């Protein structure tokens, strides 16, 4: 568990990790279980290439959520590479969604769905940045 000097759980860190775990579990579940529906709803089209890439991304998200769950029990010491990886994934995906919005080119999907995903990924990116700066001496 993540502790401060008095050996109490730092609530903000527990909140941020919990949000990130739920975020990755939600998207991995959507990508792995509802691959077809998720691709149609969020990408706008479906074929086997999209399904394969969606499943790979779901596996990556599931792995990251499991890693964060393990960190809840083992601690965050020396886990900076994992948190930088999580931040980069969230940030790059959110920037990609914002690019679709700013250029008004949703492709086969709609701007509302892309906007929701952009906001979710941006929010989680900001939380991860906050977590990294809040714990930089432990990472």
What are these regions (language model features)?
Residues 2-24, 139:
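Cytosolic juxtamembrane helix and N-cap/initiation of the first transmembrane helix
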């Amino acid at each position: 568990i993540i502790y401060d000097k008095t050996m109490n759980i730092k609530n903000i860190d527990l909140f941020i990790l919990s949000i990130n775990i739920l975020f990755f579990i939600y998207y991995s579940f959507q990508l792995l279980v509802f691959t077809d529906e998720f691709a149609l709803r969020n990408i706008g089209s479906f074929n086997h290439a999209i399904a394969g890439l969606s499943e790979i991304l779901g596996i990556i998200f599931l792995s990251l959520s499991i890693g964060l769950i393990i960190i809840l029990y083992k601690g965050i010491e020396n886990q900076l590479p994992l948190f930088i990886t999580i931040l980069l994934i969230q940030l790059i995906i959110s920037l990609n969604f914002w690019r679709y919005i700013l250029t008004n080119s949703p492709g086969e999907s709609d701007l509302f769905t892309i906007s929701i995903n952009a906001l979710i990924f941006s929010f989680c990116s900001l939380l991860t940045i906050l977590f990294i700066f809040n714990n930089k001496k432990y990472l």
